[in-house]
Curated annotation (Swiss-Prot):
Protein name in the entry: Uncharacterized protein YtzH
Domain of life of the native organism: Bacteria
Gene that specifies this protein: ytzH
Organism: Bacillus subtilis (strain 168)
Length: 92
């Protein structure tokens, strides 16, 4: 798990942190989250707890894409956003 893995996790944390701080986002950001998570999930050596976090973020991105109001969706997930970033920090 070299730099590729670390860059992917960093990208996820950046997007989630932006959502948390700015309380806004785009469909493209949700789609980016999904692509990166799919790539990370292909790694069979991932910790099962980290996979659970990725699955939660994946569900968040899926529901965000179909949300009528992205900003409201992000606002509703503020606590989860900070929790996910903290959890990713502990696994990366």
């Amino acid at each position: 798990m070299g730099l590729h893995y670390e860059h992917q996790v960093h990208l996820l944390k950046d997007i989630l942190t932006d959502h948390q701080l700015d309380c806004c986002g785009t469909v493209a950001e949700y789609e980016q989250l999904e692509r990166v998570i799919k790539s990370l999930m292909a790694n069979t050596e991932l910790d099962s707890n980290f996979k659970n976090v990725l699955e939660d973020v994946y569900r968040y991105s899926q529901s965000g894409i179909s949300s009528k109001s992205i900003d409201s969706h992000i606002q509703e997930h503020q606590n989860s956003l900070s929790q996910w970033v903290e959890q990713m920090d502990s696994y990366s």
